[in-house]
Amino acid sequence: MKAAVVTKDHHVDVTYKTLRSLKHGEALLKMECCGVCHTDLHVKNGDFGDKTGVILGHEGIGVVAEVGPGVTSLKPGDRASVAWFYEGCGHCEYCNSGNETLCRSVKNAGYSVDGGMAEECIVVADYAVKVPDGLDSAAASSITCAGVTTYKAVKLSKIRPGQWIAIYGLGGLGNLALQYAKNVFNAKVIAIDVNDEQLKLATEMGADLAINSHTEDAAKIVQEKTGGAHAAVVTAVAKAAFNSAVDAVRAGGRVVAVGLPPESMSLDIPRLVLDGIEVVGSLVGTRQDLTEAFQFAAEGKVVPKVALRPLADINTIFTEMEEGKIRGRMVIDFRH
């Protein structure tokens, strides 16, 4: 099979590999689509350690071709996911308390185990989430990572219908966060970005207020127009966005951190204490979160913006990512 494999010189080779036989509890997927994520770029570049030889991809959707012994959750013909959360230990405090993505023995697709950017992929059947009918595989691939990440973040913000939520960063992640906040949680959305083009799209997608934080004081405007957001989700990777989010929420507000800026965040501790503001981190989502995120997309409440590309384009896509030319989600199409 053809696969996108990381090389020692931080490149990706599209090469031929042979998969091993299935073990107990595993399933073989014939891949249809696999999204390309910034995390793939980090893995390729060795930012998280040398991953030479690994097959990239954690936004994969495939059709079950074969199941191994003991598999009851999947059957041939089902569509299922290859997600970042590939497998947990299944018995630690995190796995047993609904926080399985925090498992200290977690395996991650396209990082610690081979991922879905190949014509075929082996998954642990109980950890592969089924894709509902009516949801296209290309759209589902984006929900597998960006979608479930933002859905979980908005869920964790504890936002309620009619309340104000500020979304910082309206790129691939932020656009989906906006849709989940608006169309699933029925919140009023404040879109905050430094790019007017992204803000225009956000307004078209239903944002109630759009602010360019490069030219305006976003926190000040949010406080003046709404009395302070009830919550904020930060997908941007700039330290300034995190600091602004803390200033933009009202007393009792919650800031959910999703983006990973290289710098440390500055926190006004007295304000956090006196105004009861919470700052929490959110990492992807559980299998249940992904099931829910898929269903809302299948119902048409969330529509990822995707562009289909051939596997041969993978290095070009990474170059475009590094140059900031990507709009929406790039998806490798294995169906043609």
From Swiss-Prot:
PROSITE patterns: ADH_ZINC. Its EC number is 1.1.1.1. Zn(2+) 1 binds at C37, H58, C145. GO terms for biological process: acetaldehyde catabolic process; DNA damage response; response to ethanol. It catalyses: a primary alcohol + NAD(+) = an aldehyde + NADH + H(+); a secondary alcohol + NAD(+) = a ketone + NADH + H(+). InterPro entries: ADH-like_C, ADH-like_N, ADH_Zn_CS, GroES-like_sf, NAD(P)-bd_dom_sf, PKS_ER. Zn(2+) 2 binds at C89, C92, C95, C103. Its cofactor is Zn(2+). The keyword Zinc applies. Keywords: Metal-binding, NAD, Oxidoreductase, Zinc. GO terms for molecular function: alcohol dehydrogenase (NAD+) activity; zinc ion binding. SMART domains: PKS_ER. Signal peptide: none annotated. Binds 2 Zn(2+) ions per subunit. It holds the Pfam family ADH_N. Preferred specificity is towards 1-propanol. NCBIfam families: PRK09422.1. Belongs to the zinc-containing alcohol dehydrogenase family. PANTHER family: ALCOHOL DEHYDROGENASE 1-RELATED, VACUOLAR PROTEIN SORTING-ASSOCIATED PROTEIN 11. This is Alcohol dehydrogenase, propanol-preferring. The lineage of its organism: Bacteria, Pseudomonadati, Pseudomonadota, Gammaproteobacteria, Enterobacterales. The gene is adhP.
